[in-house]
From Swiss-Prot:
It holds the Pfam family Ribosomal_L20. One of its GO terms (molecular function) is rRNA binding. This is Large ribosomal subunit protein bL20. The gene is rplT. It comes from the Bacteria. Belongs to the bacterial ribosomal protein bL20 family. Residues 121-157 are annotated as: Disordered. SUPFAM superfamilies: Ribosomal protein L20. Binds directly to 23S ribosomal RNA and is necessary for the in vitro assembly process of the 50S ribosomal subunit. It is not involved in the protein synthesizing functions of that subunit. One of its GO terms (cellular component) is ribonucleoprotein complex. PANTHER family: 39S RIBOSOMAL PROTEIN L20. The keyword Kinase does not apply.
C-alpha cells in the first residue's frame, strides 16, 4: 500500500485557522492549538449574540417609545394599550422610528391612543414636563448626641 503524505493538507489547515484567528491577543493569534480553541469559543459567542441582538434592539425601541410617549403625556404601557384598543397595528420598531424621525406623526398616534383609552381615574397622570423628585433632607445627628450624653454622665459619677 502506498504511503499517504499529508504535510500539505496539515499546513493548509493550520494556516487557515491562524488566518481566522488574526487580531486575537497573545498566543491565541500565534499558536495553532490556542487559536483553534479560541475560534471555537468565538463561534459560540457569535451564534449566541446574534440571538441576543434581537432582544437588545427590542429593549432599545421600547426605551425610545417610552421617552417620546412620556413627552406627549402618556406612558409606554398606556400607549400600547391605547393602540391595541384603537386596533392600530404598528410594531415597536416602526413606533421607535417614528418617535425619532417624525415627531408629529408619533404625536398623532399618541392622540389616537389617548382617545381610545377608557377614562381611568386610577391611572397615574404623566405630565409633559416631568419634574425630578426632590430628595428629603437628612435629619441632624440628634440621636448620636443623645446616645453620648448618658455615657458622659456615667463617666462623671
Amino acid at each position: 500500500m502506498a504511503r499517504v503524505k499529508r504535510a500539505v493538507n496539515a499546513h493548509k489547515k493550520r494556516r487557515v485557522i491562524l488566518e481566522r484567528a488574526k487580531g486575537y491577543r497573545g498566543q491565541r493569534s500565534r499558536l495553532y492549538r490556542k487559536a483553534k480553541e479560541q475560534l471555537l469559543h468565538s463561534f459560540v459567542y457569535s451564534y449566541g449574540d446574534r440571538k441576543k441582538k434581537k432582544g437588545d434592539f427590542r429593549r432599545l425601541w421600547i426605551q425610545r417609545i417610552n421617552a417620546a410617549s412620556r413627552a406627549n403625556g402618556l406612558t409606554y404601557n398606556r400607549l400600547i394599550q391605547g393602540l391595541k384598543a384603537a386596533e392600530v397595528e404598528v410594531d415597536r420598531r416602526m413606533l421607535a422610528e417614528l418617535a425619532v424621525s417624525d415627531a408629529n406623526a408619533f404625536a398623532a398616534l399618541v392622540q389616537v391612543a389617548k382617545d381610545s383609552l377608557p377614562a381611568d381615574t386610577s391611572a397615574p397622570a404623566v405630565s409633559a414636563e416631568a419634574a425630578p423628585k426632590a430628595k428629603a433632607a437628612k435629619k441632624p445627628a440628634a440621636k448620636k448626641a443623645a446616645a453620648k450624653k448618658p455615657v458622659a454622665e456615667e463617666a462623671a459619677k
